[in-house]
């Protein structure tokens, strides 16, 4: 019996020693804490609907160094409250509309390295993914509040300045397409639009960073045709959801697509983002071109074949060209930026091109006017 008691006492002593060693190895915290985070989101764009700004799922992660200390989500909310964590220096990472993305247990470096791809679901505008850059905070024991008005008491962080999350996507759209042939063509040609395409669109972008554009050279197109032009990507996939039948665009019914951030760098295989309208070149009265007229138009590079009057009017979005003008003194950047709207007014002044993925000549028969804003609107005017 005594041997048994001594044996149990020995086990208890060993257990206490082990516990003490474990406690010594753990980081010392100032006490238990909670953090509540409230968001500031961009105003919705009425033309595309409330879905552009909808936060279907909001996720907040708390990091102690590289390690995830807490993660909590809320459905259909712009705040996540009472996230249980520990006091001390911490990093907050906030994301919205992450869908089935697995975030639990990821290190801070792993989260910062996350990417996303352009999908058909993005084009419905519902639940566009949003992120905020990681922010460092000092949490105290008790209740902490980020972005609140101060009435809650506790430790107020960034009082009255909620954390702002921004859409990862941008939107490019025609808000007007009009045919206004120049004197040289007004009595010869007209144009009958049939389709609108995102002709060249980046497939992937980062989710965090000063720029979300990455060096991945994969692109998507809504067109079935391979053009092999100077702007044609080497890595190119057709998806039918980046093309649609023509509907006359307006400010209240823009016609376009959601796209990802991208940068143009020809030598690196990175291409401009192109929005394009496709249709038929016709006689000035809308009747079909004659065989002779089609042959002449084909030889001029305006239509795709001497028996096919299909023509294209491409617009390189947020691009510098003498054919493009921008509203409000905006300077084009030759790239797509997250959380921007690129609203494009296209004026067609003559025949189009049979290769919309080649550079546009300064004498092209198009004018582009673009308005840029964050959820910023960029107004671009294009004249062909």
UniProtKB/Swiss-Prot annotation:
InterPro entries according to UniProt = FimA_C, FimA_N, Fimbrillin
Q: Which cysteines are joined by disulfide bonds?
A: none
Q: Where in the cell is it found?
A: Fimbrium; Cell outer membrane
List residues with covalent lipid attachment of type S-diacylglycerol cysteine.
19
Leader sequence residues: 1-18
Query: What about PTM?
Result: Synthesized as palmitoylated lipoprotein precursor. Efficient export to the outer membrane and integration into fimbriae requires lipidation and subsequent proteolytic removal of the lipidated propeptide.
Q: Where is this region: Important for oligomerization and fimbrium assembly?
A: 375-384
Query: Main localisation, per the record?
Result: other
Q: Which ranges are cleaved off as propeptide?
A: 19-46
Entries under Pfam families matching the protein: FimA4_C, P_gingi_FimA
Indicate what this protein is called per its UniProt record.
Answer: Major fimbrium subunit FimA type-2
**To which species is this protein native?**
Porphyromonas gingivalis
């Amino acid at each position: 019996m005594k041997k048994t008691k001594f044996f149990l006492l020995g086990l208890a002593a060993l257990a206490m020693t082990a516990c003490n060693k474990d406690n010594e190895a753990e980081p010392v915290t100032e006490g238990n804490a909670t953090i509540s985070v409230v968001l500031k989101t961009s105003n919705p764009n009425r033309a595309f609907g409330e879905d552009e700004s909808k936060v279907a799922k909001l996720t907040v992660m708390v990091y102690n160094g590289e390690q995830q200390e807490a993660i909590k989500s809320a459905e259909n909310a712009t705040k996540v409250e009472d996230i249980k964590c520990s006091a001390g220096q911490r990093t907050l990472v906030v994301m919205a509309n992450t869908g089935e993305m697995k975030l639990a247990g990821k290190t801070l470096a792993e989260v910062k390295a996350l990417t996303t791809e352009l999908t058909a679901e993005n084009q419905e505008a519902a639940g566009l993914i949003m992120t905020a850059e990681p922010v460092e905070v000092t949490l105290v024991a008790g209740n902490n509040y980020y972005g609140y008005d101060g009435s809650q008491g506790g430790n107020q962080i960034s009082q009255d300045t909620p954390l702002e999350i921004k859409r990862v996507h941008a939107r490019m759209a025609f808000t007007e397409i009009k045919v206004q042939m120049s004197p040289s063509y007004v009595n010869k040609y007209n144009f009958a639009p049939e389709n609108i395409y995102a002709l060249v669109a980046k497939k992937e972008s980062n989710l965090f960073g000063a720029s979300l554009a990455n060096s991945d050279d994969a692109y998507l197109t809504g067109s079935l045709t391979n053009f092999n032009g100077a702007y044609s990507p080497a890595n190119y996939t057709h998806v039918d959801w980046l093309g649609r039948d023509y509907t006359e665009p307006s400010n209240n019914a823009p016609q376009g697509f959601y796209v990802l951030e991208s940068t143009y760098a020809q030598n690196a295989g990175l291409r401009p983002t192109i929005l394009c309208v496709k249709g038929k070149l016709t006689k000035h009265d809308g009747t079909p071109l004659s065989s002779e007229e089609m042959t002449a138009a084909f030889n001029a590079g305006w239509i795709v074949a001497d028996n096919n009057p299909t023509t294209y009017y491409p617009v390189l979005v947020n691009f510098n060209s003498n054919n493009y003008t921008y509203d409000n003194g905006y300077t084009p950047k030759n790239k797509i930026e997250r959380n921007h709207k690129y609203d494009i007014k296209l004026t067609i002044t003559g025949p189009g091109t049979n290769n919309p993925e080649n550079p546009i000549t300064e004498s092209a028969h198009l004018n582009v006017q673009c308005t840029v804003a964050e959820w910023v609107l960029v107004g671009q005017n294009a004249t062909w």
